[in-house]
Amino acid sequence: RSATPLALRPGSYYALAVDLARKGCTVGLCDIGGNLLQCRELPEQSDMTDAIAGALASLLESVDRRKVLGIGISAPGPLDCENGRILNPPRFERWHGMDIGKRLSDALGLPAYLEHDVCAMALHQRSTGQSLNFMLLFIDIGIGAAIVSGGELLGNFTGELGHTTIRFDGRLCECGNRGCLETYASIPALLEGSGFRDWFDLVNQAHDPEARRLLDQEAVYLSAGLINLLNLIPVDSIYLAGDICCRHELLVERLRREIGGKALYRGRNETRIFPVADTPNMGILSAAEVVFSRFFTV
């Protein structure tokens, strides 16, 4: 007989979500249908963890507490996700060593789940059902990647692609190593000394010879890191996220040529490269998906 599509009823379960980013902190309440019901940006305060707990407690009052599965927290890495602790992410010093999971769990009486922000985005991308075998590549002030293979997030892959080495005697990185991909291919590193203010300025002047040179250079740098991963874990698709998505086609064609000419599996199926959908509040929706993915699978 014909198959019957099934879906979870949106109001059946909820998740509290916390998106910790270098640009600020956002909290929200989401339902299992992927709907953002409430969202608040929190101003900088002396004790941000207490402020987050207070904001979440306020959100919790609007729904049946028994239907709230937990608190999802996304943050830049490196992290100790198992113990809910933020370790020592660069340019994130105020959060170093913070047991954010335990503090929020104790304050609200709900389980809390910490996840690398790029891995959380990959879980959200998986929930769209577009692909179950992909890499999500985030490029902005840093670089991160997460891999979903056979529908499963590779949990032993921490997302720190930006701190893989592409030149053993290269530039000194904030992590203490030399030659990290991030020191060459993050947007600030790429544009340093170029005269372009940001990525948007660069792509809006894509006709400029210097802009074309930088786009070519970015593709070369990124391919050096990506090919190492693709040779180990081939994927069908790469999804781009971050500011790099603006005028993504300028980079995608260059990147496709670089990867296609060097990857071990060239000539098999070409790896497709797409931007992630332009989803408002993706960070907070991704943090909520960290919770839902613990209870429901694709």
Residue ranges and their predicted role:
Residues 1-67, 128-129, 172, 177, ...:
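ATP-binding/phosphotransfer module of carbohydrate and carboxylate kinases, centering on a glycine-rich
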Residues 15-19, 68-72, 134-138, 146:
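Short glycine-aspartate micro-motif
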Residues 36-133, 250-261:
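Glycine-rich phosphate-binding loop and adjoining helix at the ATP-binding site
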Residues 39-41, 48, 95-96, 102-209:
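Glycine/GP-enriched mid-protein hinge/lid loop-to-helix segment characteristic of carbohydrate kinases
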Residues 78-81, 119-122, 144-145, 154, ...:
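Short, active-site-adjacent cap segments at secondary-structure transitions
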